[in-house]
Each structure stands twice: as structure tokens, then as C-alpha cells.
């Protein structure tokens, strides 16, 4: 390598030099587990150098799609109640500054409205506290998921309980709403909740069904149109190649969950950004209790950079677009992480700590260290 200094990303290396260094070695790419060739590594090092130069040229780090913000990530769909604090620590190191946790099905149907009330209290209360103790801002969406809408008595009781949570701090939308099996009871619950979102001036996060996805997505958008809900205030999530064009054509935000076994993979996501551009596209992990990855957004961003997707486009799909739509009701604000509160793990939530016996509390004052630049 030539021109190396201690500054992050301050190096240059040509493909020929890398060929010599890597001769006879087989390396795996940390982003996609594919072969790491000299050409691919050279491109990655070049991207790092370019992004670092852009950051150094903008000391105020204004939100322009370059500099430090190019390395910041919002994961706008992460079921953190199902994850450990190790995941929060790993996400923070990867550049995640904020997560949005949608209310969802826990893997087993709830049998009483009290279970739902406790769950809503958890994701709007303790989970928000827990994330903050590890340097990540936490927001949530509140709603009755379609899978449990088929228990009519439970669904009606839950919908009656929603208003008390829709006004809580950190609630940025209603969701996940939509269809699972596309039954009449799911339709009834969806329509009631759309009207609640209009009443409380909240955006909506839509869950599209795993089965018969295209038909369910089109039906959902038809219902939203019937209720005169503004597409610019609605995120249609779990999209794929079958649904993207129609969702974009109708003016909705189009989100993709990097959940390779059932939803979307990183390579496919990169190809969609290349084909359709970044406008109104959002990348999330949908990490939960299943086989999923809380670092999926960061890994996808790296893969897109390796494939030559521009820094501005990457910034849009992993940060700017999510902030634009989920910041509409004012609960999510970029200043929450640009001027963060102190981290003090001595703090308790209703008498409880995030630590266990023998652990040393982490205490940090506002502001990020000077060497905090993260290249995605």
C-alpha cells in the first residue's frame, strides 16, 4: 500500500499490488461470504478513501448524503424485543443510530387484550430505554397485526386499547397493519386502523402477506385508496420484484426486508436499487426471533458499495428515506442522535437496570469520538 497514514481510510492501493499480496490466498468477503478478489478489495479500498475525503471536506457533517451521515444507518423495521443487548452493541458498532420496532406477532397467538397492553408498554417503554443504554435511539409503531385480527373478540378489544399508546413518546406510525390470509376479519381490522391513523395524524407501516403477496399488496393499496389515505404517509413493507413497480407507481414508500430465506436478499436488493434508483426505497432487517440478522442493513450497504452503487443512493435507502417518512409526526428527529443524550448505565427503568451483577456501568457524555467515522 502507498500513502498510508493513521487517519481512517487514508490509504491507496492498486489492483496489481493487491494481486501480489493475495497470490495463493483464498479470502471470503465479510459482506456476502463470496470470494474476495483483488479487484473487489481494490474497489472497496477506493470507496473508503473517497468517502473519507468527502467527510474531511465537510467538517460540519451536514446531512447532504456525504461525510459522516453517509455511514449512519436507520433500521426502520427491527423487532428488538426478540434480540439481545449484544445485538444492540453490534448494531451501534456497525453505524446504526436508530431503530424502529413495529408491533408484531410474537410467534404464538395472544389470548387476551392484557397481553397486548403489556407488549405495547414494553416496546414503547423499556425497549426504548434499553436501546438508549447502548447508544441507539429506539422508536416504535403500534397496531394490531393481521395474523391476530382473525380472533375477532381479541381484535376488537385491542383496537379499542390502541389510542392510549398512539400518543406516547417515540411512536412514529401505526403498524404493522395489512393482510396475512386476506380474510374478512383482517380486512375489517385494517380499515378500522387506517381510520385511527388518520385521526391521530400518523403514518402507516403495511405488512404484505407471505403468501399471494402481489394480490395482497394490490388489495391493501386499493383499501388505502378507498379510505383516502395519502400514499406519501405510508410505507409498504416486505416488497419484492413482484410488487416494487406497482407500489412505486402508486406513490407509496417501498420497503424491503433483508431476510434472505423468506423475503429479500442483499444481492437482489442491490440489483433493485440499480434498476429503480433510490427514490422512496427503504432497506430494513425485520430481525426477530427467526433466522435473521440485525446487521443486514449494514451488510447490504457494503455490498451495494462494492457493486458501484453511489454513496448518495446508499445513504437514501439506509437512512434518508426512512427518516423522511417516519419523521412526519415529529417524534423522530435527526437531532436525537446528532446531539445525543449521555449514556449512563447506572440509570434505572422502573427500578430495573440493563446490567447484571458484576458488570461495570458504561458512562459517556454527549458527542461522538473524533475517530467515529464508519464506512459502510
Please annotate each region the language model reported.
Residues 14, 19-22, 31, 45-211, ...:
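Mid-domain alpha/beta scaffold segments of enzyme catalytic cores
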Residues 27:
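Cys/His-enriched microdomains
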Residues 31, 48-64, 298-376:
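Mid-to-C-terminal alpha-helical segments outside catalytic/metal-binding sites
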Residues 34:
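Short Cys/His-rich local motifs and their 1-3 flanking residues in nucleic-acid-associated proteins
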Residues 38-42:
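Short Cys/His-rich "knuckle" micro-motifs
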Residues 95-97, 170, 199-201, 225-231, ...:
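Glycine-enriched alpha-helix->loop->beta-strand junction motifs that scaffold or abut catalytic
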